[in-house]
Design a protein with these regions (language model features):
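Gly/Ser-rich catalytic/binding loops embedded in alpha/beta enzyme cores
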Residues: 2-179
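Fold-level recognition of mixed alpha/beta catalytic cores in primary-metabolism enzymes, strongest
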Residues: 142, 163-216
Length: 216
């Protein structure tokens, strides 16, 4: 099965392939990491990679589908890109600002933890403009993120790195946040599905978000 055949599959199709043993979570995770590192030179969409934990979690997922451990969870083995404004234990969270370039979190946001508890695998963090306050994705800290379909254009913002990750097949699902279009603009610009859930459906994080306008 070629790289093109499965890196663009939906999470549902990947899970079905894992269950039927047509695909291995470990194989897919390795390919996602490889793809992301190739794409980085072209689009500059990623800020941090989690190779070790991703491969460890992928092996756990693989054993689950082989019936060696626990029952597969809802998102077992599904690769997850995390927007850089969200906290993941032992990872950097600058929100695109030099002010917080050295901040490393000792906790994981509830929104992300729920995805991890469902079996998803964190593989990297994605770029965002400074404090997520632009409809494009660039910052003095991380530079300019470009659209994978045309490098002269933006992928939108502020979840532009996540949009690129999905559009390039570097992950199956990606986190984002949306006040004035920060999920919807990258989805439109990159040609992927983006959903802004109703207020209250997800925990309100990060804590600086703007009350009823904030949806993760």
């Amino acid at each position: 099965m070629s790289e093109q055949d499965y890196l663009y599959w939906s999470a549902k199709n990947l899970i079905n392939a894992f269950k039927s043993k047509k695909l291995s979570p470990l194989e897919v995770t390795k390919e996602c990491l490889s793809r992301a590192k190739k794409i980085q030179n072209e689009c500059n969409a990623f800020t941090e990679y989690f190779d070790q934990i991703a491969l460890e979690q992928a092996k756990i997922a693989e054993n689950s589908y082989l019936g060696k451990t626990h029952e597969p969870r809802l998102l077992e083995g599904i690769s997850l890109a995390i927007k850089e404004e969200f906290a993941l234990n032992n990872s950097h969270r600058s929100s695109g600002s030099k002010i917080f370039k050295d901040r490393v979190d000792s906790f994981t946001d509830v929104y992300i933890q729920r995805l991890l508890d469902g079996g998803s695998i964190p593989i990297f963090k994605t770029t965002t403009p400074e404090f997520c306050l632009l409809g494009t994705t660039w910052s003095d800290l991380h530079g300019v993120t470009t659209n994978p379909w045309n490098k002269k254009y933006t992928p939108g913002g502020s979840s532009g790195g996540s949009g690129v990750a999905l559009a390039t097949g570097s992950c199956a699902i990606a986190s984002g946040s949306d006040i004035g279009g920060s999920i919807r603009i990258p989805a439109a610009a990159c040609g992927v599905f983006g959903y802004k859930p109703p207020y209250g459906r997800n925990p309100e994080v990060p804590y600086g978000n703007l009350d009823y306008y904030s949806h993760s």
